Amino acid sequence: MNRSKGSSSRRTFLRLAALLLPAGALLGSLQGVRAAARPRKLYLAGPDVFRADAVAHGEALKALCARYGFEGLYPLDNALPKQLAEPREQAAWIYRANIGLIERADAVLANLNFFRGAEPDSGTAFEVGYATALGKPVYGYVDDAGSYAERIRRHAPELIGEDPTRDRDGMTLEEFGLPLNLMLAVPATLVVGDAEQALRQLASRRHG
C-alpha cells in the first residue's frame, strides 16, 4: 500500500515537472552554465602594442587564438577616431576602448614578462586587476621560471644591493616562490612559456 502511494506521488511530481520545465530545459541550462565557464573570447593584454610590428603581431596572436578555438580581442582592433587630435582625448578614448574589450571578453590572456625594468607592463597589470575584479579568469605567461626575486636578480642585477635579499635602495625583494608580485601571481594562472603554451593550457581546461 505504501509502495503504491509512493509510486503515485513520484508520477504526480514528474507530471508537474514536465508542465513547469520543458523537456531538455534543465540539461540545456546546465550546458549553458558549463559553456559560460569556458572562455571563448580572450582579451590579449600585454606590452605587445608597443612593438614596431604591433599590428602584425596582434594578427598573429588572434590567429593563434583561433587555432585553439578562441576569439582574440586585441587592443589595436580599436581604430582611433581621426577627429581626436588632442593627446589627452586620444588617451581617454583608448582607455575606454580597452575597458570595453575586457568587459566583452570571457577571460584575459596576458603577457606578463618584464617590460622596461623588472616588472610587467603597468597598463597590463591594471588590466589584469580590472578583469579579476569583474570575476574573469586571467591566464598570464612569462618566459622564464623562478621566483620573483630570482627573476629580478637574473634580469636586472644592477638593481640588487649588497644584501641580495634587498634592492639597491634597501627595499626587500618579495619572495613567496611566485614568479611575480603576489597581487598578480595569486589571482592569475601563470604559465612559463609563450602565448601558445598558455593557450594550450587554457584549451585543455576548456575541454576538460
Segments (PLM) and residue ranges:
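N-terminal secretory signal peptides that target proteins for export/translocation
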Residues: 1-3
